[in-house]
Every structure is written in structure tokens, then in C-alpha cells.
Amino acid sequence: MLDILLLRKDPASAIARLETRQKPQPFLNLSAFQALEAERKTLQTRTEELQSRRNQLSRQIGISLGQGDPGSADTARAQVAASKLELAQSAARLEQIQAELQTMLEAVPNLPHDSVPVGADASGNIELRRWGQPASPAFALKDHVDIGRPLGLDLDLGVKLSGARFAVMKGQIARLHRALAQFMLDVQTGEHGYTECYVPYAVNAESLKGTGQLPKFESDLFSTKKGGQDGEPVPDNTALYLIPTSEVPLTNFVRGLVLTEAELPIRLTAHTPCFRSEAGSYGRDTRGMIRQHQFDKVEMVQIVHPATSYQALEEMTGHAEALLQKLGLPYRVMSLCTGDMGFGAAKTYDLEVWLPAQNSYREISSVSNCEAFQARRLQARFKNAQGKNEPVHTLNGSGLAVGRTLVALLENYQQADGSVTIPPALRPYMAGIAALRP
């Protein structure tokens, strides 16, 4: 959530930065916001006046009674009663206005950092660097579906069990999928300093509001809202949502906390399934495992001091790159433009891995600095050197998406005979097996 003080003091600057996101709809009705703000200020001033007047009259009652003047005391009591009524009405309206302002702010995305390239969509993203050279084998390349089926990938069974965009893995390929997740966790915890966590796969609405998925992106979530006993709807305050990413529970670890500077940075990681309805993705990546309703991911989250958050962004991007390099997978790093960034991000780097069958790079990790945007929603703060409570900065990133890494391994390490070479870094997790064979 944006700092409301910025919108009060310099709304033109905030709107100008928001407009660089280049979306068709306005993010904030500025005139409505300013009208509510004007009423809030008037009511706040009047409320303070009424409180002061009530306190003054209450003192006067005591003085009048002490002086043996019950008539004056009765007059003061009547005035106190009238001021209490007006005070209650003012307080109720003030609470309503603050709720309306909160709702407005919850719909406004984060301000892009000044270093983010300006653009309308993915075509405006800027390539920063590449690593690795895509191979050019002499044999005809297959995609991960054709490679994976003889190795235990069963998409038809996924459809039978659950519907489109679900997959079943058996035998060798299931083992490789598990090995990838274990490898990623071991690197993140053993080399990069993250604390491994086991988290719930279903969270409450407050957790999703804290990280920014609710209320704006509810259509992309799976929930229990319509799954009550005997078909009765579940009230919103008791509904649970399947996590779209373990960023949600991990970042919510610090919801409502006031940390010390000594506790920062906090580095957390978790391997979880992720669940997304993929609303708006109809017709995209319908073949194979690129875009699934359920997929596994190892997530990185850092909670840091504001002064070090952009250093942490570079560090986390390097942590994701290290995994791809250990696996020998060619990739490139993209700086996302203003129009392609996520709702809560101030700056994002995407890592895109080379997929030979598509002859293109595809996203395998997204690493974002949300600055204080999530922290304000979460009321996650630390006590700074001046002794004041200040929002922390939060960052998150994939380290990595397990299914897409599996896809990249199958396609980049495929052999002419249909086998798939296991990269050396993974062999300890595969009991020394050097290749998967049909």
C-alpha cells in the first residue's frame, strides 16, 4: 500500500509515477480521494474541538458542584450530552471515511522505482545479461511433453483426475522433480543463508491482503468460500485460500511485528505447491507443464532494512542465477518495464531460461523489491536508530520454479536416443544416476 502522506503532500508526483505503468484504467480517482481527504481533515479538527469542549465541560461540572451551584452543573451536563452525541456522529463518519480511503489505497499499485524502464508491456523489458550458450544438436529436437511421456509424465491422467492444466508424474521423472526441489533448498539454505520453513498451503484472507493478492486478484485464487457444509457459502472471514506462492505465508511471518534493527535481514525459504486459477490465460501455453493450476516452487523471501533493499534485490537475483548456473541451463536476466511489473513491485528482474523446443527464453524466476508497499499493509515495522517505528522492506523471488526447471532440463539435456542426461549437480540426489532412459 502506498504511503498516504505522499498522496496528501504531493499527489501529482505519485500520479505521474503511477501513469508510467501505462494501464488503461486510472489507478486512483484523485478528485474523489481529495474530497474524502478534505472531509476527513474537517471532521478530525471538529472531533478534536468536541473532545476538548467535552473535557472542559466535565471539569466545569465538578467546579460548579464544589461551589454549590447545581443549576450550572445541570447546564454543563446537558451540554456534555449534546457534545457526546455530535462526537459519536463525527467519529462514525470519520471511521467510514478512513475505511473508504483504505479501500481506495488497496486498489493502487506500487510506485515504480526511478531505475525501472518505462514501457507498456513485455516488449519494453530490457535484457541485462546472458549466461550460457544454447546447444545446437544435430538431431531433431523434441519438446518436454514428447520427451517426458516415456519417462513417466502423464498429462492425460492429470486431466482425468482434475481437468486441464494438471499433470501426473511417475517413476523416473517424479524422482527428478523431487531431486530438483531438494537441490534448490540445499543451495538456498547451505550456501545463501536462508532458513528453511514449512508453511500452511491454505491461508486466510488477511494474509493475502497483506501481500497484495486480495482484494484485487481474487479471481486468480482457489478458495473455500463456496465449499461450506451442505453447500452453504463460507463467510469471507473464515474462508481459506490455497497459496498462489509461498511468498504469502513467509512474508506474513512479520505481520503486526515491530522488529529490532539487529533482527534484520531475515532470509526465509520454502518448497511448496502453488495454486493458481490462471484467470486471463485462456489459450496460452495449453500444452505441457509451462502453465499449470498446481506447480511446485522454492521461494526466497527477505525482510530487510530500507537502506539495503536494492542491494538485497541484486543478491537474491544472484541466488536464483546460481541455481541455473549449477544446472548448466542457459538463461538471460531481464529488467521488467513499468507496464509489465506486478502489482506490488517497485522493481523486478525476471530470469528466463532457454527452451530449445520453443526456440525462446521463458520465465523461470521473478525477483521483486516491494519496498515498504507490503509492509504497510502488514503493519510490519522495525525500530530505527532514532527510536521510531518504520516499515521494513520486503523482497521475494523464485529460487526456482521446480516444474519449469524440469521442463528446461528435459529439453536442454535431451539426447538423440530419447534419454536425458542428468547434470552433475543433481546426481547426488538421484543416487548417482547419470541419465533417464525410456
Curated annotation (Swiss-Prot):
The keyword Protein biosynthesis applies. GO terms for molecular function: ATP binding; serine-tRNA ligase activity. Pathway: Aminoacyl-tRNA biosynthesis; selenocysteinyl-tRNA(Sec) biosynthesis; L-seryl-tRNA(Sec) from L-serine and tRNA(Sec): step 1/1. Keywords: Aminoacyl-tRNA synthetase, ATP-binding, Cytoplasm, Ligase, Nucleotide-binding, Protein biosynthesis. Its EC number is 6.1.1.11. CDD domains: SerRS_core. It catalyses: tRNA(Ser) + L-serine + ATP = L-seryl-tRNA(Ser) + AMP + diphosphate + H(+); tRNA(Sec) + L-serine + ATP = L-seryl-tRNA(Sec) + AMP + diphosphate + H(+). InterPro entries: aa-tRNA-synt_IIb, aa-tRNA-synth_II, aa-tRNA-synth_II/BPL/LPL, Ser-tRNA-ligase_type_1, Ser-tRNA-synth_1_N, SerRS_1_N_sf, SerRS_core, tRNA-bd_arm. Pfam families: Seryl_tRNA_N, tRNA-synt_2b. Its main location: cytoplasm. PROSITE patterns: AA_TRNA_LIGASE_II. GO terms for biological process: selenocysteine biosynthetic process; seryl-tRNA aminoacylation. It comes from the Bacteria. NCBIfam families: serS (TIGR00414). Catalyzes the attachment of serine to tRNA(Ser). Is also able to aminoacylate tRNA(Sec) with serine, to form the misacylated tRNA L-seryl-tRNA(Sec), which will be further converted into selenocysteinyl-tRNA(Sec). Consists of two distinct domains, a catalytic core and a N-terminal extension that is involved in tRNA binding. Homodimer. The tRNA molecule binds across the dimer. This is Serine--tRNA ligase.
